[in-house]
Amino acid sequence: MDQNNSIPPFQGLASPQGSLTPGINIFSPLITYGTGLTPQPVQTTNSLSILEEQQRQQQQTQQSTLQQGNQGSGQTPQLFHPQTLTTAPLPGNTPLYPSPITPMTPISPATPASESSGIVPQLQNIVSTVNLGCKLDLKTIALRARNAEYNPKRFAAVIMRIREPRTTALIFSSGKMVCTGAKSEEQSRLAARKYARVVQKLGFPAKFLDFKIQNMVGSCDVKFPIRLEGLVLTHQQFSSYEPELFPGLIYRMIKPRIVLLIFVSGKVVLTGAKVRAEIYEAFENIYPILKGFRKTT
């Protein structure tokens, strides 16, 4: 009697998929597909396609909104969607998570402030040119002017000197003049004007045109001896050293374009500058290098 009236648990409610899985849909939204007890039918295709379709529609809606806003503001539409979460950088966009190491452009090692030379090169000579704007009779100038000499067999220009500023001028028959020996830019211009005035007083219609400084020469002393042999080996592409021909090392700096004469005693001569700042910059560039080849005897 008990066997006839007893009913197995969940009998009649069993699912054809398996006796352990109830036929009634009791899945919670918090439970993932399949319980691990029995394989579940593939039900993710439609749900995933629906989710993908919804995401695609949202992206299209936001993209169209951005395009309309950018067209109204005159900006280029952006291709980056804020809802896309990824750690990899997208092509053409800024990564969401920047690298902790910021790339830097390789530059020359800067000289520390503690290694500043504290030495200011002194200007020794300035060469300037000026155009007097007229043809000149050099014989007349040499005969009538003071402190002037003219020997056409040796040099085709009148050599004239004045005491203040203590300079020398080369005056050519074409009206061009070269002034040398000044210690500053102001002295060079003043001396050139004095030479032009002398030529005017001799009866020539001299003007003062196109004054220009062509070269500056400076010098200084680093106060320690230098190993020139090691310097020329390390900086072969910039320097040359032939002690049998010239006792100084010739260093041709690229920027600024200055030529330096470096002597073993520590004396340095800088030439080729057009402005004073180039001499100062060149010396500050070469000083740490010279310090690295200091003699320790």
Curated annotation (Swiss-Prot):
Coiled coil: none
Entries under PROSITE patterns matching the protein: TFIID
Signal peptide feature range: none
InterPro entries given in the database record: TBP, TBP_CS, TBP_dom_sf, TBP_eukaryotic
Record's comment on post-translational modification: The N-terminal domain is extensively phosphorylated.
Region Disordered, residue ranges: 52-115
Biased composition (Low complexity): 56-76, 104-114
A molecular function GO annotation: RNA polymerase III general transcription initiation factor activity
Biological process annotations from GO: DNA-templated transcription initiation; embryo development ending in birth or egg hatching; transcription by RNA polymerase II; transcription by RNA polymerase III; transcription initiation at RNA polymerase II promoter
One Pfam family this sequence matches: TBP
Annotated Sequence repeat ranges: 123-199, 213-290
GO cellular component terms, semicolon-separated: nucleus; transcription factor TFIID complex
Residue ranges, compositional bias (Polar residues): 77-87
Highest taxon listed in the record's lineage: Eukaryota
Cellular compartments annotated: Nucleus
Similarity field: Belongs to the TBP family.
Subunit-structure text: Belongs to the TFIID complex together with the TBP-associated factors (TAFs). Binds DNA as monomer.
Function, as annotated: General transcription factor that functions at the core of the DNA-binding multiprotein factor TFIID. Binding of TFIID to the TATA box is the initial transcriptional step of the pre-initiation complex (PIC), playing a role in the activation of eukaryotic genes transcribed by RNA polymerase II. Members of the TBP family are differentially required to regulate transcription and development during early embryogenesis. Binds to the promoters of select genes.
PANTHER family documented for this protein: TATA-BOX BINDING PROTEIN (PTHR10126)
Entry protein name: TATA-box-binding protein
Organism: Xenopus laevis
Phylogenetic classification of the source organism: Eukaryota, Metazoa, Chordata, Craniata, Vertebrata
